[in-house]
Amino acid sequence: MRLRWMRRLGVALAGLAVLGVPGGATSSANGALPADQIVFMVDVGGGLIPPVVYAMESPALVMYGDGRILSIVKDNTTGAVPARYELSRVDPIAVAAFVSAVQERGIVNSAEDFGMPGVTDMDATTVLVHGEGAPAKVGVYAFYESFDKGLTVEQQRARATLRQVIDAAYNLAAVGTRAPYTPDRIAVFDVGTESSSQSASTPWPGPPPAGFLKPDP
C-alpha cells in the first residue's frame, strides 16, 4: 500500500513539474492557503440538455485550501440523478504548490484564446484558480480533443496546456486518502410552470397502468 501511495505522489509531483514549478514551492508565508477557500475548481455544464439534467449539474472537481478535494465518481448515470462524490484529503502544502504552479503558468487567464470549435449545442468547461490575490477563471467551449481540429496551433496548445492542469489536479486528488462523500445539505431547484399553460401535473390519459404493467417474471 505504501508503494502505491508513493507512486501516486510521484505522479502528482511530476504533474507540478510539467506546470513549471518545483513540487516544494508554496504560495503563502505559512505554506498553506485559507482552509475554506476554493482554490481550484473544474465545472462542466451547459449545452443542449433537459431542464432536469441542468438542475442536477455540479462541479466535476473542487479543491480547498486545507487539502480537501471533492471529485465526481464517474458512472453510467445519465445526469438525471445527483452526482456521487469522493472526498480526498491531501497535504495543504501540496495544494498550495499546485495552485502556485497553475498561477505561474498563466493558462487560467480570461485573455487566453482557446478557440471556438464550429459545433453547436455543446457544453463548456470552466476552470477557476484562487491562490493569493484575486481569483481567475476561464471558460472553454466544446473542450474535447475531437473538436480541436480546425483551431489554430496556438489555440490547440492552450487547450492542451489546460488539460495538463486539470489532469494534475486529478492526480493530486489520487494521492490522498479517499472516501465516499456524504453531503450535509441539499438544494432544491424549482423549474416552475409560469411559462406553460399546463398545470404542474397532468392526469394520466391512458388506461389504468395496472391493466398493462406486469412485473418481470
Tell what function each PLM region has.
Residues 2-29:
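Secretory targeting and sorting signals
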Residues 61, 98, 102, 127:
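Short, structured motif recognition centered on aromatic/hydrophobic residues
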Residues 24-49, 53, 107-217:
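Short, well-ordered, aromatic-rich surface patches in folded extracellular/luminal domains
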Residues 65-66, 91-95, 129-136:
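A short, structured loop/turn motif at beta-sheet edges
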Residues 83-104, 162-165:
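Long, charged/polar, surface-exposed segments that mediate recognition or autoinhibition
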Residues 30-74, 78-93, 112-114:
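An N-terminus-focused feature that recognizes amino-terminal "leader" regions
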